Amino acid sequence: MQIDRRALLGGLAAAVAVPPHLFAATITDATGRTVTSPDHVARVYPAGPPAAVTLYTLAPDLLLGWVEPPGEKEREFLLPEIAARPALPRITGRGDTDLNGITSLKPDLILDIGTVTAAYSSLAARVQTQTGIPYALLDGHLDRVGATYRALGQLLGRVEAAEKLASTAENTIALIMQRSAAVPPEKRPRVYYARDNSGLQTGLGGSMISEPIEFIGARNVAADLHGAHGTATLDQIRAWDPEIIITSNKDFAASVAGNPDWAAIAAVKAGRVHLAPNLPFGWVDYPPAVNRLIGLWWLAKIFYPESFPQDIKTLTRDFYTLFYHVTPSAAQVERVLTGRD
């Protein structure tokens, strides 16, 4: 693995070389709130995992720490200095967030990325009022990745770097969407997404959990069960009879072929159960951030192989180089793609 230290050192150099007043910016975040960054942003607190991942891809030097610190296997694909940063408490709306602990870290900005709802908007406003720290909530949906990067780039004074990531994301999405849209409806597979070791927890229609699957036009068999996530029954899954099963659980992936309860389902009979890669972050649903962009390529090649001849190994290497600031070896890419670590 080659480490792109320019991503870290370049950010540090920019912070020193650019006059501080050039960093100040005011944006309208995804909730419609006006957020003004301070004159100099050097420490950013991520409210949750999507914010941490997105901030890492753009400005790793500014990341104070991780709500869910990467483990040993994940750290292999991240900048060592940043991956080793400490655990931070998640900011929630349940009243159990230690705001004094957050302010003691002296962040210049609190960043949240994800679903934009009235509850999250209220949380952002309340935390900003109580701490005096600017709090930006940006949209985490795939079709908003470019806009989110550009807004974040403005806040951080990293406009050029943000534009590179935004353009790459938008061009990738446009290409995948264009080719997916050309697939006739009758050739769009029925897909079931299994999230746990029982295979019964799934992503429901319109949720961020199942967003990548639905985004490229596959038919999520659980789409009529609206919400975030839920539990299906075996009888429901048998009735849906998915042609493809995508799973993020390695135990389920390893056991389903030998499980008689699943034997009659089309995807199992055809050997079309696919374990999603998860290093350093999940490729399909968690955390729901830009890490799912490479997952779109992976899913598209599974769903529509004739329309997507691109080499997934090359795509993986290039994505990790640009977004994670490391260039994995061929052996590392192979290990990522097996999804079994």
PLM region descriptions:
Residues A51-S104, L109-A118:
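A short, structured surface patch at a secondary-structure boundary
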